[in-house]
């Protein structure tokens, strides 16, 4: 199954300095509907919370525009048209390991699983950084990540610039995923 890594990073940065981070933090150019049209059925959403406890999308230090609940509602509508459940991987994007972020993430995961669980299958519930399991979703999903930051065959600059590895390896890796690894979710940058 095709999935997109850091699915919301196509969105515009929330802060002006986010524009400087794009070469290092952007992992998708296409919006969620375009990702769906490319065949993606799994979405990797990275969540953090503001001081008021409102969730937002982030990748590293870059916050991106987009309403978390609006995106989940849009995905719910897409599942009704597709007549199939989508998979959503949720990650707490908080490498600083703050306890208040962890508590908010647990509540968020519980709420969205109850509200959207009929339409989407949620999995993972980990915190980026130490990859500790924060929320134990019912569904367990094996994944492969064909992304430069985690790839053994990535060149040094491909580990910090997602587009470079995707440009060089996506075609071959997608063929491998289709031929050999089709029983797992395969996450890609720049589908």
What are these regions (language model features)?
Residues 67-115:
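Catalytic cores of phosphodiester-bond-cleaving enzymes
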């Amino acid at each position: 199954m095709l999935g997109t890594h850091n699915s919301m990073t196509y969105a515009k940065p929330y802060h002006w300095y986010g524009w400087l981070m794009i070469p290092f933090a952007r992992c998708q150019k296409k919006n969620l509907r375009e990702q769906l049209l490319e065949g993606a059925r799994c979405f990797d959403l990275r969540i953090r919370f503001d001081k008021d406890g409102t969730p937002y999308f982030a990748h590293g230090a870059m916050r991106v525009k987009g309403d978390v609940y609006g995106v989940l509602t849009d995905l719910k509508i897409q599942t009704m048209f597709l007549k199939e459940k989508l998979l959503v991987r949720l990650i707490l994007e908080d490498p600083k390991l703050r306890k208040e972020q962890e508590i908010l993430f647990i509540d968020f995961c519980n709420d969205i699983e109850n509200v959207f669980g009929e339409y989407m299958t949620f999995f993972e519930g980990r915190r980026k950084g130490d990859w500790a399991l924060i929320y134990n979703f019912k569904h367990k999903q094996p994944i492969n990540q064909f992304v430069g930051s985690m790839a053994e065959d990535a060149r040094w600059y491909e580990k910090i610039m997602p587009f470079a590895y995707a440009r060089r390896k996506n075609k071959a890796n997608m063929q491998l995923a289709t031929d050999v690894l089709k029983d797992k979710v395969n996450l890609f940058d720049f589908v």
